[in-house]
Regions:
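C-terminal edge-of-domain segments
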Residues: 72-82
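N-terminal acidic leader/helix
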Residues: 2-29
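Small side chains
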Residues: 17-18, 55, 67, 76
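Short intrinsically disordered terminal tails
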Residues: 1-2, 81-83
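Acidic, low-complexity, intrinsically disordered interaction modules
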Residues: 28-69
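Domain-level marker for long, solvent-exposed, non-transmembrane regions
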Residues: 19-21, 64, 82
Length: 83
């Protein structure tokens, strides 16, 4: 389970999602996989809650890793590090 946080304007939104940042068998997290799933989860959250605007200052966190990016408009910008 991972905690996802993002901002639309000055408003912060946080929710939990069943995303594993590093899967069993991976030597390190696959940024592209995590970024793709993160984008899908945030889009679903925005649609389900009728939010307007683009998510900014996005973070994903689990018990071992933290991933951060300013936005998801450009693929490959998610930076993941260990806690």
């Amino acid at each position: 389970m991972s905690k996802i946080t993002f901002y639309i304007g000055e408003e912060s939104y946080t929710f939990n999602a069943a995303i594993e940042i590093k899967l069993d068998g991976e030597t390190k997290p696959n940024n592209l996989r995590v970024e793709t799933i993160l984008s899908e989860e945030i889009s679903r959250y925005i649609n389900n809650n009728n939010l307007k605007g683009k998510p900014k200052h996005i973070s994903i966190e689990d018990e071992s890793f933290i991933g951060e990016c300013k936005d998801l408009s450009v693929i490959g910008k998610l930076e993941i590090r260990t806690k």
